Amino acid sequence: MAARGRQRGSAVGRAAVVRCCSCLLLTAAAAFAQDSISSGSRYYNRDGVYVPQDVSGYRTYVYKDRRYGYQPSYLDPVYRGPTRAPEDRYLYEGTTPRFPLPGILGGWREDLQGKERPDSKHFRDRDVLVNTNYGQVQGFKVQLYDDPHARHRPWNIAVERVTKLVNVFLGIPYALPPTREGRFKPPRPHRGWQLLQAVDWGPACPQPSEYTGATKGVRDVDEDCLYLNIFTPSVASGLAHKYAVMFYIHGGEFTHGASNLFPAHILSAFYNVVVVSINYRLGALGFLSTGDENSPGNYGILDQAMALRWVYDNIAAFNGNPEAITLFGPGAGAASAGLLMVAPRTRHMVSKVIAQSGSALADWAVIIDKYRAQNTSRVFAESLGCSIESSWKLVQCLKDGRSFLELGNSELKPHVGMFPWAPVLDFNFTIPEDTWYEDWRMSDWHFFAEKPEESIKARKYRKDLAYMAGVTTQEAAFIIKNNVTLARNRYIIDSDLFDQKVWELVLQYNYTLNPHGVFEAIKYMYTYWPDPKNVTHIRDQFISLLSDFHYVAPNDKIAKLLVERHVPTYLYVLNTSIEALNSPQWMRVPHDTELLWLTGAPFMDVEFFPQKFKLNRDMWTDNDRNMSHFFMQAYSNFATYGNPTPSQILGLHFDLARHGQLRYLNINTTFNSSIQINYRQTESAFWSMYLPTVIGHLVPTYPPVTEYWWEPKQPLQIAFWSMSTACLLLLVLSVVCCMLWRNAKSKTKAAYRMRADNPITTIAETS
């Protein structure tokens, strides 16, 4: 027995020692983590890669190779799995050498510096340093070998003479990584660094794998993705005037895209603007909303707002003018620009907007209906096997029980609307209080104060705002192109299929008051009456239908509101194709045609672009080069002067749009473009006025679900409701006991009265 007692005592002692050691290790780890994120640390672009100043390895660059994945290390012991798209892994063979250092520090990187020419090895003074409010940033200079202003455009000979230099800073973190506790929460400002080597693109935010991979330009995705890139003509001090700033927000329906798909070297260097491109959270990670305090949503648009704040506070160090920031981008990027233009937290920072094929007033730009957002979140959670009994359980399952790859790669077809994810109107949502989380305050959560249309009508934007917008003639061709069913049928649409697609549209948008009337109205508007059975015209009309509904009509609506309030507004319609692509006739001018022209692709080395966009120099035509020069000059002029053509560009000029006479530049080529008025007014009015007011408003319906979610969220709430329940039970028990006691007392009194009234009976019982 004594030996057994000694063994038990020894075991207890060992357990105590183990617990003590564990506590010491945890304390030390916490202390190291706290030190590692101090403002005096050296920061290396990825979550967990911090080296404190006082350790021996401070000067050693610790790098996780983003280009080829990475393995666990002592700084980040968790293996996160491959981040490349599976279909592109064959591009990375085991014999491929790993770069010992990131970006250009490990050797010449053609995707960052262009083609390596004989004189590239003698390139001196490559590195450039800039001091920001967050610490010092190291970038690099890139040599450019073609000149958009040159009269002679060499299209079939090698270009070997350096014509310009541009200063490039890639992968600058504008917020703390939105990982772990930061998932489904607003972004937090970065805490700074001592020296940041901004020499490689940051990873893209998680998105479906069909959009990722080396051939598509998105080599790596990671939840730690809140980075921005800066291109500037010069960082030298003493400039008489700062450059205008062009803030690029990528499109992609709020579900895919990346900042590195817009290399802005030519635009910045030759047109004297500072260009900034950003990543922001996408899909469910960026826009999941339960309509309450568990996940209000809008994290992606809040990321954009924080990036804009970072630029506003720091861009002067890169010779950018913070009071001349122009937001631009295609599709979702254009819609985001319009929302930031009127949002309370950002409107004072936005001086101009260029909306390419997108509008803040589009149906897909903002989810107005709270229950639509909740329904999308429930359907998404169910698809990943999460409980939807309450919003708290739903969010906890997605936050703690699913990886970012699972969340990013899960695609969803919405019950209502075009795209599943978008900013949601949140001004009446309940949000977490200041005491709920250490790093977040109530002011961090709300983005909207009212509907965007109401903000525009109330003139809640900068007084010096200028607006420019454009659409293409075949905006929705990409929807047809990406439809797998239509692809199997060689994109042929006959009258029966047209009717089917129109009915799908009617049902998807739940025109429940008169669905048959809506169907007939749409069919009448978009039937090609000279030859109703012609499948070519039917396909063209269907593309026009979707283009007008999703892009043209919303663009027309916001333009009219701004023109009525005397905001300088310039419009264009793009009606010419990129000749080098040789696209089929029905999709010559699709959505975001301007991308390759705005990036100066006809003048850039092909190495800057992913395989998807690589076009040899001899494929570009003179018209492509002219259009590229025109768009870069017009956009940069607008950012600088508020007018895209203060003087003619290749013989072309814009006119201001006016009330009752919406003038727009109809861009065919630089030889036969012209100013016209009132683009597709009948079709725009059909979608904006006729359907909503005459046939019936949008009345969305959803699968039956519990209307209200409830679940304890915080310890104080759990304690409160537990005590409340206990008190209620005690109260009920007390009432029951009182009633029983009173009943018993009543019976006792009645018995005494009976005995008092019958003394003979009482005496008999006694005897």
Residue ranges and their predicted role:
Residues 1-13:
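N-terminal secretory signal peptides that target proteins for export/translocation
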Residues 747-767:
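Cytosolic C-terminal tails of single-pass type I membrane
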Residues 365, 404-622, 719-735:
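Substrate-gating cap/lid region and adjacent catalytic-acid/histidine neighborhood
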Residues 643-645, 733-749:
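Transmembrane-helix exit/juxtamembrane "anchor" motif
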Residues 65, 215-391, 456-480, 567, ...:
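Serine-hydrolase-like catalytic core of hydrolytic proteins
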Residues 13-33, 171:
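Cleavable N-terminal signal peptides of Sec/SRP-targeted secreted and luminal proteins
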Residues 35-299, 322, 609-631, 639-649, ...:
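Non-catalytic accessory segments of hydrolases
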